[in-house]
């Protein structure tokens, strides 16, 4: 269905530019702010293209009910939710199969980066609320979630940072737009820990060749260097603002 519709809509023009004017390896604008919620242990807000996502972190705290505890390490519970007004057609409130699947893969990705062994019998709750959706929400939410965890002071082996790539009109492109996600031939979200290059999330929707997959991975790995810098700047800016406030 996706490939049939792609034939009807031209997503790459004769100048090899995408519908939004970007080149093949160009990111959409990204802005991250840390420490935006006073009542959460840690929080972050991200705008990535048209995505607007808020993340709140609570914990580590004793896991409840007790039968859910793991004696060896903390349990990371990510809850990804799309607000009813986040998409063009009003979304029915509450979890569905897609949001449950995304919550699971984000929980697993964050568990790989957090030093969960330091907190036996504990849980860390990560609430990801999509206020406005514009393709790539799972990666944007995960990228903001790791900033919120750092804001909460949760010990981590490394931050998690990710991006998407995909196949559009036969070309591999970085950071799919909404139209490219809907009508392109393939979508590949990947998240890594930059220090080691370990992949903590990788999925694929659509068909690509082996060479195209490696091309997508190269594009994403290069993009994560830029996105990782934006994450660090968000955390540094929070403490700069605090220092200015205390100085006054």
Curated annotation (Swiss-Prot):
Pfam hit, one: RNase_PH
SUPFAM superfamilies per UniProt: Ribonuclease PH domain 2-like, Ribosomal protein S5 domain 2-like
InterPro entries (UniProt xref): ExoRNase_PH_dom1, ExoRNase_PH_dom2, ExoRNase_PH_dom2_sf, PNPase/RNase_PH_dom_sf, Ribosomal_Su5_D2-typ_SF, RNase_PH, Rrp41
Subcellular location as annotated: Cytoplasm
Protein family membership: Belongs to the RNase PH family. Rrp41 subfamily.
Described function: Catalytic component of the exosome, which is a complex involved in RNA degradation. Has 3'->5' exoribonuclease activity. Can also synthesize heteromeric RNA-tails.
Subunit-level organization: Component of the archaeal exosome complex. Forms a hexameric ring-like arrangement composed of 3 Rrp41-Rrp42 heterodimers. The hexameric ring associates with a trimer of Rrp4 and/or Csl4 subunits.
Protein name: Exosome complex component Rrp41
The organism of origin for this protein: Thermoplasma acidophilum (strain ATCC 25905 / DSM 1728 / JCM 9062 / NBRC 15155 / AMRC-C165)
